[in-house]
Amino acid sequence: MTTVYTLVSWLAILGYWLLIAGVTLRILMKRRAVPSAMAWLLIIYILPLVGIIAYLAVGELHLGKRRAERARAMWPSTAKWLNDLKACKHIFAEENSSVAAPLFKLCERRQGIAGVKGNQLQLMTESDDVMQALIRDIQLARHNIEMVFYIWQPGGMADQVAESLMAAARRGIHCRLMLDSAGSVAFFHSPWPELMRNAGIEVVEALKVNLMRVFLRRMDLRQHRKMIMIDNYIAYTGSMNMVDPRYFKQDAGVGQWIDLMARMEGPIATAMGIIYSCDWEIETGKRILPPPPDVNIMPFEQASGHTIHTIASGPGFPEDLIHQALLTAAYSAREYLIMTTPYFVPSDDLLHAICTAAQRGVDVSIILPRKNDSMLVGWASRAFFTELLAAGVKVYQFEGGLLHTKSVLVDGELSLVGTVNLDMRSLWLNFEITLAIDDKGFGADLAAVQDDYISRSRLLDARLWLKRPLWQRVAERLFYFFSPLL
């Protein structure tokens, strides 16, 4: 009996160490950033069982077999659609400003399509204004409405949008709504999904959370885009979820969420529509390519039109493109660079690009919320402040609520707005969208918004920062070490 017990014990110990060795080897063989690999190895060797389970659940990018097959299957038809779109030469920009040219060329080479011109663009900073404009557009819709959001929180004006969407569906408008399962959990546990489906709206719960499949698909891979397309002519995107700030996370202690959205008219709606169609096919298996270019796209030739490029990320989309776009934008800056983000946990490359810009004389400012709804990210962000301040970067802490806007402005001419946070999750994991806009007029509008944010912020004093308590420094370094995993 003792011999059997001893044998089982030795086999268990051997299996335990073989499991650790196997996972270690898998981490080392995967092409990933060194800080990320080191952080995973530390967790696994300090808390082996917890670390191994965590790594198998969220350590690698698993879209899931069914979705991965759909992603592969959709590309031939998507590529053909893009080639057909290229025949509409009048919608594509032939040249860009000197500051935007490198980024637009990068996007064209990697996505197979140039930036589109002739778009009308309106920047919106008040949630009420966004929802009122959206309700008007829904009421005037003639053919189709597509929406995707990370969060749809019932209550307030979000319910008015839902009512207008159901009214549109009842009068024959084809309405599709895709919401992230985790972000919109309150919505899916409310009466709204059934009400909408009964009205004729196609409602899809994207990347459904299923603990039984935790090792088959990465559960923290989320659908983080916020997009609306109406009649393949009007489009919205930005940082705002479908929530009324007066009813959203009021007990979080961070104040109301401050967002930014862009309302657009023109060919950009078609460029965003193909992104939506890819997401829809990956999730449902149904192909809904936008109408052919000769039916959908009007010959916009206004001199006042904006040139815009869409940058999409996520499984099935060009790998690392949003990260490359941010690096390109930072290195293109000659006069000033202003970045706004709620979550700042950058890659080493992006941090280096930001600091290098400041060190070569560019006026660099980063605007972050003083209070954050994520304690982990809040502490991890602080770990980067010393290096930023030493390089000459101005760090502003916004005090008027949770600043949720994601924006970048380069030399007043190249603007980036969308859903991308400056953290690892947005850069390399989630389904995201960013608009790159090459236009001085829009740059001036964005600069005015950012100036307003700065006026409601406190500039971090480098001397006072260096005098912060020791316990804060220890906490920052601890969270910094695990920042590649956040």
UniProtKB/Swiss-Prot annotation:
GO molecular function per UniProt? cardiolipin synthase activity
Which stretches are transmembrane?
A: 3-23, 38-58
Intrachain S-S bonds: none
Origin organism lineage: Bacteria, Pseudomonadati, Pseudomonadota, Gammaproteobacteria, Enterobacterales
Please list the reactions this protein catalyses. Answer: 2 a 1,2-diacyl-sn-glycero-3-phospho-(1'-sn-glycerol) = a cardiolipin + glycerol
- Where would I find the PLD phosphodiesterase domain in this sequence? 219-246, 399-426
User: Where's it mainly located?
Assistant: membrane
Q: Which CDD domains match?
A: PLDc_EcCLS_like_1, PLDc_EcCLS_like_2
Per the record, the domain of life is Bacteria
Any one GO CC term of this protein is: plasma membrane
Q: Write out the GO biological process terms.
A: cardiolipin biosynthetic process
User: Is the keyword Transmembrane assigned to this protein?
Assistant: yes
Keyword vocabulary terms for this entry: Cell inner membrane, Cell membrane, Lipid biosynthesis, Lipid metabolism, Membrane, Phospholipid biosynthesis, Phospholipid metabolism, Repeat, Transferase, Transmembrane, Transmembrane helix
Q: What class of enzyme is it?
A: transferase
Could you tell me where this protein is found in the cell? Cell inner membrane
Protein's recorded name = Cardiolipin synthase A
Q: What family does the database annotate?
A: Belongs to the phospholipase D family. Cardiolipin synthase subfamily. ClsA sub-subfamily.
SUPFAM superfamilies annotated for this entry? Phospholipase D/nuclease (SSF56024)
Name the species this protein comes from.
Escherichia coli O157:H7
Record-listed E.C. numbers: 2.7.8.-
Gene3D superfamilies per the UniProt record, alphabetical: Endonuclease Chain A
Xref: InterPro entries: Cardiolipin_synthase, CL_synthase_A, CLS_N, PLD-like_dom, PLipase_D/transphosphatidylase
Residues at the active site: H224, K226, D231, H404, K406, D411
